[in-house]
Amino acid sequence: MAATTWAAGIAAAAVVLPSLYVYTASVIATRFPTLRNKRICLLIAHPDDEAMFFAPTLLALTRPDTGNHVKILCLSTGDQDGLGHVRRTELKKSAMLLGLRDEDDAFVVDDPDFRDSITETWDTDKVATLLSAAFAPQLSRQQAAASAQPPMASIDVLLTFDAGGVSAHPNHISLYHGARRFISALTAGKPGYACPVDLYTLTTVGFARKYCGFLDVFATIFSATLGAGANMAASATSGFGGNNKRDIKNKSDKGNPGLLVTATGLLGGRESAATARQAMTQAHKSQMVWFRWGWITMSRYMYLNELRLEKGS
């Protein structure tokens, strides 16, 4: 009897939970704020980061109706195993599967200052300098000029890892610190001006949430709405807006949302988890060792992303 009850419960969960996820993903796609008509750069450390960690974001932001132009800047060739030339090509193929307009929109840096290493932390100033050269080459002239000259950049939005790096990889974490340094440099000596680039970072979650697949959507939505509620309560009691970065109603100085949540579909189609997996299995074939099969099946980052606007950079 007990075994029958358990079996019935499992069967019901196998139907109800995916259905709830599909509904929740559709709500996220239609009701949560997103970015439109922006020049966006995804900053990653290694070829395959875009597929393993940011696929839901790329699939959402490259939808034709958003009007965004998304590019990828990868700071290493991933040459730790001597496959840098292969992985460079794999990244471009993955980028096209994930919706980028052209292979040339995925650029790979090959520089000894940014070696693929699980033990190496990249220099913050060197990361920031590279970003300045790529997106704000006039930065040194701006700093030398009168403060009345507004800061400028060739991108509107920069996406990268947060301080936890998702997997605590030092190369990932280095991007976070370098990106923040770059954002700060844009407005250094320019009081009163809004930063021309909004920085969003991918939220790192704990082990249990990381490997619960699409089920983490419920914790993610709860976290986002709880943050919004806390912010509204703070506003009501103090008369001022709160500082909770998870507040979905919080906006940047340019009016961009304070939180970006994206989710892939479970069924087929362009914005599905199957497409995210294909970016690994069809593009990054050199990286498909045994444990990555577990990642692309169980990781919540294949199904959903939560990126927060960085304040006070």
Describe the residue ranges of each PLM region:
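Active-site beta-strand->loop->alpha-helix modules in alpha/beta enzyme cores, enriched
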Residues: 2-195
